[in-house]
A protein has these predicted regions:
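Transmembrane signal-anchor helices characteristic of membrane glycosylation enzymes that use polyprenol
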Residues: 2-27, 108-112, 201-217, 295, ...
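Transmembrane alpha-helical segments
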Residues: 15-16, 322, 342-370, 408
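Transmembrane-lumen/periplasm boundary regions of multi-pass, lipid-linked membrane glycan transferases
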Residues: 34, 41-47, 53, 60, ...
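Transmembrane-helix motifs of polytopic, lipid-linked glycan transferases
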Residues: 65, 73, 77-97, 135, ...
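Membrane-interface transmembrane helices that cradle and orient dolichyl/undecaprenyl
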Residues: 96-97, 136-154, 162, 184-186, ...
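Short acidic/glycine- and proline-prone juxtamembrane loop motifs at membrane-interface regions
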Residues: 115, 121-128, 304
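Short periplasmic/luminal acceptor-recognition loop of GT-C membrane glycosyltransferases, typified by
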Residues: 381-416, 432, 436-447, 491
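Aromatic/acidic, Gly/Pro-rich catalytic loop(s) in extracytoplasmic/lumenal soluble domains
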Residues: 426-429, 434-511
Length: 511
């Protein structure tokens, strides 16, 4: 039944999403700050507090050591659980729409989606957002089919979880409120005003409860934090902006979307258009939500592949529903053989979806086993003179902690100067004067300064030009000693280059 479906999809997804999630916390630029909030009892409200609160509770219940690595790994487990919850919710949604077999197929298709698998490995809020969106879609279908107080409260709670996952999750209100207003409940006492009050109370209670600063002793202004985040989304990030709308996310989908997923999701859209009169509003919402979300993020100059996660996660669901529509053409309720043929068609098309999803999933899984920063540190230890001085982009990770100067706990015996961006340590000439002999740069850091579609934002032009000029000179005048190319998992394979900028020492004369 559906409970077995939900439990099996959740457990299977959770086991998959927690594989190889023990890499160093310093590899992800955001995880150190988040674990610091948990350990120090600080909350900055850059994002809603659901993920951090669950991480804090899980670490205390599990008697986890209050160290950065232990807390981050606990938080990654929480993120994996939320992602697994999203897969289970979408499996139940497919069951409600197209039957139990479709539910199993959708659960497998969503769980094996490579972007969801990767993002579930980080202490980041994106899985919490996807969980809330998936639960909201399920709740919308349940409310429409059985309008009552329980399903209405569930819809309010689910929408609250979407908003408390990430602030952008509040977009669920765009479809949830009209569904509450337009759809009459079976209970005559549930008038429009009563429905709105019940929904609003459930939503507000969930949002406020999820943002309670549990175990926190120091808070920053939530209004200032939210304002800063919104400015970054609307205006750009780290002094860099671009023209909007842009096609970055469409290009990502075109490049990464498995063909079976795209074709069968398109088939579902065509099926809805061809039978529009007998379709329910929640069915249309299931299609329009990812399309609307894609349009929204394409109007923000702040770009990251993880922002596409809600779209990437919902597309396998739509593809499975498309497969179910095709199977429905074959199947006839009064014929056992036709029903069996329809089930075979659905299973076969779902197998096609899974088969096209497996190559990127295998690549992502293998990516979490390749640790380039550790290889770089080992190579430097073995091949550079002990008196070398290395300036690095922090993403190279010779220094686990951001030092903004000389690193105290370098992973190599050589002296390391560390900053978020190596140019912030000084110009090439200034670094040479300080005795710097080598520069280690990271594509994940410098590539933004060589993208024709990006540019400096207002007062950030001076810093933008300084960083670009620094990298250009290193690439032009430095001697490339070794390169570790960028890989699938950019936090473990960020694309590292090691240059010598000081003249090579002449060999000592023979005695």
């Amino acid at each position: 039944g559906p409970w077995l479906l939900a439990v099996a999809v959740f457990l299977g997804s959770f086991v998959l999403f927690t594989r190889h999630n023990d890499f160093p916390y310093s590899y992800h630029p955001d995880e150190s700050g988040k674990c610091g909030q948990v350990i120090k009892g600080i909350r900055n409200y850059h994002h809603p507090l659901l993920l951090l609160s669950l991480t804090d509770v899980a670490s205390r219940v599990g008697f986890v050591a209050r160290t950065p690595q232990a807390i981050v790994e606990t938080g990654r487990g929480v993120a994996a659980a939320l992602a697994a919850g999203a897969a289970a919710a979408l499996a139940l949604l497919a069951w409600r729409c197209a039957g139990l077999l479709a539910g199993w197929c959708a659960g497998a298709a969503v769980a094996l989606q490579a972007d969801l698998f990767e993002t579930a490995h980080y202490l980041k809020e994106d899985p919490a957002l996807v969980f809330g969106l998936a639960l909201s879609l399920l709740a919308a279908h349940l409310w429409w089919r059985a309008p009552g107080r329980k399903t209405l409260r569930f819809l309010g709670i689910a929408c609250g979880l979407a908003a408390v996952g990430k602030y952008v999750g509040i977009i669920v209100l765009i479809f949830a409120v009209p569904l509450v207003v337009w759809h009459r409940a079976s209970d005559a006492a549930l008038t429009r005003n009563v429905r709105l009050r019940l929904f609003a109370f459930a939503f507000a209670f969930t949002f406020l409860a999820g943002n309670l600063p549990l175990f926190a002793t120091k808070l920053t202004s939530p209004f200032r934090s939210v304002s800063n985040e919104m400015k970054g989304v609307a205006g750009g990030h780290r002094g860099i902006t671009r023209e909007v709308p842009h096609r970055e996310y469409l290009d990502m989908l075109r490049k990464d979307l498995p063909p079976a997923v795209g074709l069968l999701a398109g088939a579902y859209v065509l099926a809805l258009l061809g039978t529009a009169r007998r379709r329910t509003p929640p069915e249309w919402v299931t299609v329009l939500l990812p399309l609307g979300y894609l349009a929204m993020i394409s109007c923000s100059p702040k770009i990251a592949s993880r922002y596409l996660l809600p779209v990437s996660t919902l597309l396998p669901l739509l593809a499975t529903l498309g497969a179910a529509e095709i199977a429905g053409v074959v199947r006839a309720a009064d014929s056992r053989w036709r029903r069996a043929a329809g089930a075979a068609v659905l299973a076969g098309l779902a197998g096609w979806i899974v088969w096209t999803e497996l190559p990127p999933l295998r690549t992502a899984l293998a990516g979490f086993t390749r640790d380039d920063p550790a290889e770089v540190a080992a190579w430097i230890t073995a091949n550079l003179p002990p008196d070398s001085v290395i300036a690095e982009d922090h993403r190279v990770n010779l220094s686990p902690d951001k030092a903004d100067g000389a690193a105290k706990f370098a992973r190599v015996p050589q002296k390391v100067l560390d900053a978020n961006f190596a140019p912030d340590l000084g110009s090439v000439d200034e670094l040479l004067a300080k005795g710097v002999t080598h520069v280690a740069v990271c594509r994940a850091s410098y590539s933004r300064y060589f993208n024709d579609e990006t540019g400096a934002q207002g007062s950030g032009k001076t810093g933008y030009d300084k960083r670009r000029d620094f990298y250009q000179r290193v690439f032009r005048d430095g001697e490339l000693l070794r390169e570790w190319p960028r890989g699938t998992i950019t936090y473990l394979q960020p694309g590292i280059r090691l240059y010598r900028i000081a003249p090579a020492k002449a060999p000592a004369p023979a005695p």
